[in-house]
Amino acid sequence: MKRGEKPEGYRQMRPKTFPASNYPGSSRQMLQEIRESLRNLSKPSDASKAEHNLNKMSTEDPRQVRNPPKFGTHHKALQEIRNSLLPFANETSSSRSPSEVNPQMFQDLQAAGFDEDMVIQALQKTNNRSIEAAVEFISKMSYQDPRREQMSAAAARPINATMKPGNVQHSINRKQSWKGSKESLVPQRHGPSLGENVVYRSESPNSQADVGRPLSGSGIAAFAQAHPSNGQRVNPPPPPQVRSVTPPPPPRGQTPPPRGTTPPPPSWEPSSQTKRYSGNMEYVISRISPVPPGAWQEGYPPPPLTTSPMNPPSQAQRAISSVPVGRQPIIMQSTSKFNFTPGRPGVQNGGGQSDFIVHQNVPTGSVTRQPPPPYPLTPANGQSPSALQTGASAAPPSFANGNVPQSMMVPNRNSHNMELYNINVPGLQTAWPQSSSAPAQSSPSGGHEIPTWQPNIPVRSNSFNNPLGSRASHSANSQPSATTVTAITPAPIQQPVKSMRVLKPELQTALAPTHPSWMPQPVQTVQPTPFSEGTASSVPVIPPVAEAPSYQGPPPPYPKHLLHQNPSVPPYESVSKPCKDEQPSLPKEDDSEKSADSGDSGDKEKKQITTSPITVRKNKKDEERRESRIQSYSPQAFKFFMEQHVENVLKSHQQRLHRKKQLENEMMRVGLSQDAQDQMRKMLCQKESNYIRLKRAKMDKSMFVKIKTLGIGAFGEVCLARKVDTKALYATKTLRKKDVLLRNQVAHVKAERDILAEADNEWVVRLYYSFQDKDNLYFVMDYIPGGDMMSLLIRMGIFPENLARFYIAELTCAVESVHKMGFIHRDIKPDNILIDRDGHIKLTDFGLCTGFRWTHDSKYYQSGDHPRQDSMDFSNEWGDPSNCRCGDRLKPLERRAARQHQRCLAHSLVGTPNYIAPEVLLRTGYTQLCDWWSVGVILFEMLVGQPPFLAQTPLETQMKVINWQTSLHIPPQAKLSPEASDLIIKLCRGPEDRLGKNGADEIKAHPFFKTIDFSSDLRQQSASYIPKITHPTDTSNFDPVDPDKLWSDGSEEENISDTLNGWYKNGKHPEHAFYEFTFRRFFDDNGYPYNYPKPIEYEYIHSQGSEQQSDEDDQHTSSDGNNRDLVYV
């Protein structure tokens, strides 16, 4: 019947792997015996005998009918082989060993219409040099001669037609049986598979000759044609190579006749047992695709091409015929594995075929044989035949090695994967017949004669030749299903591997076991079917699509099968579904279910093909690529992050304890009742909980609306901004990461963030949030509307001594508060002293501040081995003016000289030499005393009107500072009081005798501050100067900003981002530079620092600030954790 057509009730079955034969001896011994017997075989074949066998097969189990390979010329040789294998056949007959089917398969091959002429012609063309040569010639002829394909297809069709829908299960490609028989028979050294022999010469022609005559290949062709998962031939592929396959179990109610009415020779039995393990697994894999019987390396008869259930007898003969070379292993049907009783032949065929498509090729007689003991599936017979059939694949551990050694399992998996993709795909089978074509041609010519049994070819070529049937059967066989009794020796397993023409089969192997495993899971209830996928495939075998297994040349091992196969191998899902369907149907062994399942599995198989292991792996690679896009960090970055993170976690804990202690102290001072105290404790706990949650909130610049720029710095700007949600006013300081990195200011920025976060006093500008984006760092701080001290100095010129005394007293308290926190400001100057609306000062710009912490060391943030100079460690040119030879460079170094000079000038931007202590400039080591030097210089400037060491260039200024003993002069015209002059002289001197060495109290005790009461809060006293502020956003106290210096938004940001990314990638700068930068203050009152937006109600600062501190602020007066993410309550 035409490809794609299926006999009514026909069910496409996937070829099943045949269990290893019962051969008692080692697989190698069996193979050697087979090899020897094949060498001594005579080529004449008894056509009549073959026909008799074929008829016998067809009568015994129409399902098992496949195009019987004709071994007309070699019939005698085949008979001799059968005789030598009778002992094994007897053993396998009990287990339904395929050896019994051998005589029948010969007859079936002849009855199937395989011409002996092809075999004869092959022998003539090859001058009877060897069986291998004849098989190769027949393979080529079968590929080239479509007529023979039609003949082989026609031979298979009658069998399909004869099959009964009820009993007929889709012929299962018995490639495995072919594999098992042949591999077990043929020594492993025959590397190439039959397909290879057909399409390619076997790897070891000698071994091929030794193997003896494989089936003329007609059997394989018949198998390929008859193998359509439907069990009926869809378009007959070019005659697939004939492979010995165990016929499917006889239809229900029928007792499967032993394969080949005569049991295979005893020699076959042992080999079949041995093969059952290795051969079954390997051959199921490699034999699933039809291979010329002669090509089967392992001596396993090539799996018969189970085109349709109608061909079971011929299939059995084929299996035998492929074996007839004298090494034809007896292949038990998968059903026999399940110990299907003859009474259950129909069930066995249905289940066995679905489970082991290859086995269906074996005559029902062989099916009736129980699988060799290694296959535990025998008990599956107890199950309903259909259950056994469909569940057989599931019941035997798919690739679980239930009965088959894992060594066999692995090779079988390899070939199984390939074959699974080939099985049930008519297109693939058609394509595969190339490798199986030689056997197919031989089959039309009655080609059991093919003298050249290419053992290597059978292994791989089977998997390739019977893409459809082979895969289906292979999947089933690859599982340790008892369905196939094909004797398989470990050697055959190795051979399939040798036969593998492509590395991809290994990938297939990986997936193939998955398919069988998955299939068995759905069908696990039914143990008889070891390969659930096989079961599914058997269901797909019903649909004509699956039933068109054309075994032309073996297509490229894996991908092509997947692409071309449609239903032969159900995809994982399809397999599982058919298994589920078949499980219910297993008891029935209903072909209708199989056909329906086969249709579904066909579609699923297409999907499965689409999702071949290769495709899956490719997808995984894509995922890996996506994962690789995630930035990976260096060990240094990890170390840096973990050190800071752990330090901050511990710090946060200490701050929580401190806040709790503050609350207790405040409640004790106020004298709250116990109930009130409990209520306050609960409130604190709630705030702590909210803080832990809220500090993880993300912040970005979109939360703030910029109102006006207040100032531009070396690498940042300060703007007045309003928070969108609370409408509160803040001063936002923005730093470009690019500039921070270029100027090596990472450590300074980290120090500034730490001091602002930890500082919780009125002398330091309060930091509310710090966060960052890819380009910038952001500090959100109190807005101080009074401007800075430098602006006031410029406007007033010289301060009255009382005003100077007031500001210096507050500055002393502010510096003391910084020192108490363990920091050194290092950059105390009028520019960094802000005046609030009440006239009191606050320190800001802690860019040069340091806490002598490892995170504040600029060298810690440098990548590479080139140490960069700390920004506060001035260059050597500062030390000695003569060292700066910027103009004395050689012309080739002029460009470098210019950069060197710029470096000198840059230091004037980082710490003006006018206010820097000499020990800092000399880098002789400095302490907190350096800040007191700056206080003396500022006092001098307030009273005199200019800095004491003013010079034309920073270099000269530095030299004056270093030589302060000679350069420091208080001009008499300034008319300073003796106390003021004395304080200046005592502050501006060497650190060893500088005032403040013993603490700030020394300075407070100086006569200059005799009118200042440091015991009371200076901030509560009225200031001598109160700035004028007309409205909340008044910025008149700040110097106007040059419009040309304003930051421009736009393309520059993109360039900055690109630059940063390039630096990080090139390792120029460490990626951990800005770790742990984000921060959120513990009590920020939802953005209202004083419960009202600033500075509208700024006059309430004191009252509300005191209220906050009395209850809550005291709890949190310590600055919120250093590294708390910015979160707003």
From Swiss-Prot:
Modified residues (Phosphoserine): S278, S463, S612, S673, S908
Gene3D superfamilies xref list: DNA helicase RuvA subunit, C-terminal domain, Phosphorylase Kinase, domain 1, Transferase(Phosphotransferase) domain 1
Enzyme class: transferase
Active-site residues, record numbering mapped to chain: D827
Record's compositionally biased regions (Basic and acidic residues): 1-11, 46-64, 578-608, 620-629
Cross-referenced Pfam families: Pkinase, Pkinase_C, UBA
Short sequence motif PPxY motif 2: positions: 555-558
KW Phosphoprotein (keyword) present: yes
Region (Disordered): 1-71, 148-216, 228-276, 292-317, 363-407, 432-492, 513-630, 1104-1129
Residue intervals of the Protein kinase domain: 704-1009
Ranges of biased composition (kind: Pro residues): 235-268, 300-312
Keywords: ATP-binding, Cell cycle, Cell division, Cytoplasm, Cytoskeleton, Kinase, Magnesium, Metal-binding, Mitosis, Nucleotide-binding, Phosphoprotein, Serine/threonine-protein kinase, Transferase, Tumor suppressor
Residues engaged in binding ATP: L710, G711, I712, G713, A714, F715, G716, E717, V718, K733
Bias (Polar residues): 19-30, 380-392, 453-481
Oligomer status and interactors: Complexes with CDK1 in early mitosis. LATS1-associated CDK1 has no mitotic cyclin partner and no apparent kinase activity. Binds phosphorylated ZYX, locating this protein to the mitotic spindle and suggesting a role for actin regulatory proteins during mitosis. Binds to and colocalizes with LIMK1 at the actomyosin contractile ring during cytokinesis. Interacts (via PPxY motif 2) with YAP1 (via WW domains). Interacts with MOB1A and MOB1B. Interacts with LIMD1, WTIP and AJUBA.
Function: Negative regulator of YAP1 in the Hippo signaling pathway that plays a pivotal role in organ size control and tumor suppression by restricting proliferation and promoting apoptosis. The core of this pathway is composed of a kinase cascade wherein STK3/MST2 and STK4/MST1, in complex with its regulatory protein SAV1, phosphorylates and activates LATS1/2 in complex with its regulatory protein MOB1, which in turn phosphorylates and inactivates YAP1 oncoprotein and WWTR1/TAZ.
Family designation: Belongs to the protein kinase superfamily. AGC Ser/Thr protein kinase family.
Protein known as: Serine/threonine-protein kinase LATS1
